[in-house]
């Protein structure tokens, strides 16, 4: 999962392109954290798909700043929601930020075996 965090951070833009879930999917796939390209369309659906199809578990963490590096944070809000990966210096999806998303955190997900 550390590799996914590094890939996400390296591919992120300074500002949002409104494609957070696409960039997180690509980082997870390139890192080998998922066996295929996730099929859900909306960021708010990411947690359900990662747990049901790819062996991720939902962590009992409710503060995004306490999420382990490499974990996937899923938020509701803004219609489609938002998803980002915790990095060593903050958070990354289609953009990088030192601050977590302000939407309501749905869950923090990690693949414990990877």
Model-derived segments and spans:
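C-terminal partner/receptor-binding element of secreted or periplasmic proteins
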Residues: 100-114
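...with weaker cross-activation on analogous glycine-rich loops/strands in unrelated enzymes
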Residues: 36-104
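N-terminal capping segments
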Residues: 1-48
């Amino acid at each position: 999962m550390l590799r996914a965090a590094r890939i996400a951070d390296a591919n992120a833009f300074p500002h949002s392109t409104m494609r957070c879930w696409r960039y997180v999917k690509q980082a997870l796939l390139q890192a080998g954290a998922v066996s295929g390209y996730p099929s859900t369309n909306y960021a708010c659906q990411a947690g359900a798909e990662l747990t049901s199809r790819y062996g991720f578990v939902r962590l009992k963490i409710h503060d995004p700043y306490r999420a382990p590096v490499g974990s996937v944070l899923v938020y509701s809000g803004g219609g489609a929601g938002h998803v980002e990966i915790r990095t060593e210096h903050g958070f990354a999806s289609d953009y990088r930020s030192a601050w977590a998303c302000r939407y309501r955190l749905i869950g923090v997900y990690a693949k414990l075996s990877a």
